[in-house]
Amino acid sequence: MSLAHQVLAVNNDLPIRTDKPVHSGKVRSVYWLTAEDSARLIKEKGYNVAADAPLAIMVISDRLSAFDCIWHAEGDVRGVPGKGAALNAISNHWFELFRQNGLADSHILDIPHPFIWIVQKAKPVMIEAICRQYITGSMWRAYSKGERNFCGINLEDGLQKDQKLSELLITPSTKGILKGVPGVPEVDDVNITRADIENNFAAFQFKQKSDIDQYEKLLKEGFNLISGALEELDQIFVDTKFEFGYVTDASGNDKLIYMDEVGTPDSSRIWDGENYRNGKIIEKSKEGFRQTLLSHFPDPDILLNKDRMPERQALAQDNALPIDVFMDLSSTYLDIAEKITGQKIVLSENPKQEIIDILARDFDVII
């Protein structure tokens, strides 16, 4: 089977029984199960949720998203081999560590296949919850231009690129475009301050103002737990993005939980510890691919300037990247996943058929 067929690039066309439109994200697709199938599975599987809780099947793909665009390689390769399985394996590992250490729950109820999560519907908080332990990326770009206030946080003079910060910083941005929020521009992923959130907590979908403290607590707890585990592997947890939402438990209580993936090479920067101590940055995340793109094209401003999005989308659509770029990134994903989980990531020959077979046999949701 060709490489193009081994990757799961299209994941929104599975014959899963649903009475709602399939939600297709940059990497994952979400199939909302019917009320009947949700209730049946909750009873059959013993999921610890309300009897009438809506369930969904979340299917990850191997697609490669960067700078808000989907990229492809020569030979019509439209995904990175092993990427989806690696991301899910890492998230599953961290969520299990969270559970063992008494942290908040996630929306994941079951993991029947490396590409599949059975999830409970959650109401998302409209914040990209970003934590930073080092000054790099967009924070460094702003700082190097003379900005000393970032997301409402005052930064001292004299900081150097990639140095460790004196404390863990929370630098949130909006999740999508929020309209009608005083002081918050109506653009995607715009930086915000804690004061913005406090003054408009309902607009960000917090149920109560005190939940802001809870989200920051969960953010720091999750970051510190992953950072400590990576430190034991001589890997540096540089920064990351968490997402949060509310679910209703079996007793009818609303609770704030972790959503989506955590601590992955897609949502985080991870550096090799030994090389960092020797003054060299070796990326163990998608950040390496982003840097490759910035050097690959003659005008990197297209990738960084949100006002040039049509040009950026055309760039991604019209340019097949060298296959070596995708294979190098595949090695990065698989290597860090195997290092974190301690287990080899087994690649599927035909992931789509495997998914269909399991969902038919064990869940009876294939039409």
UniProtKB/Swiss-Prot annotation:
The first-level EC class reads ligase
* Reactions that this protein is recorded to catalyse: 5-amino-1-(5-phospho-D-ribosyl)imidazole-4-carboxylate + L-aspartate + ATP = (2S)-2-[5-amino-1-(5-phospho-beta-D-ribosyl)imidazole-4-carboxamido]succinate + ADP + phosphate + 2 H(+)
Please list the coiled coil stretches. none
Which UniProt key words apply to this protein?
A: ATP-binding, Ligase, Nucleotide-binding, Purine biosynthesis
Database matches in Pfam families: SAICAR_synt (PF01259)
One GO BP on record is: 'de novo' IMP biosynthetic process
Q: Which GO terms describe its cellular component?
A: cytoplasm
* MF-aspect GO terms: ATP binding; phosphoribosylaminoimidazolesuccinocarboxamide synthase activity
Q: In which pathway does it act?
A: Purine metabolism; IMP biosynthesis via de novo pathway; 5-amino-1-(5-phospho-D-ribosyl)imidazole-4-carboxamide from 5-amino-1-(5-phospho-D-ribosyl)imidazole-4-carboxylate: step 1/2
Documented EC number(s): 6.3.2.6
Question: Which InterPro entries does the UniProt record give?
Answer: SAICAR_synt/ADE2_N, SAICAR_synthase_Vibrio-typ
Family in the record: Belongs to the SAICAR synthetase family.
Q: What name has this protein been given in UniProt? A: Phosphoribosylaminoimidazole-succinocarboxamide synthase
The gene from which this protein is expressed is: purC
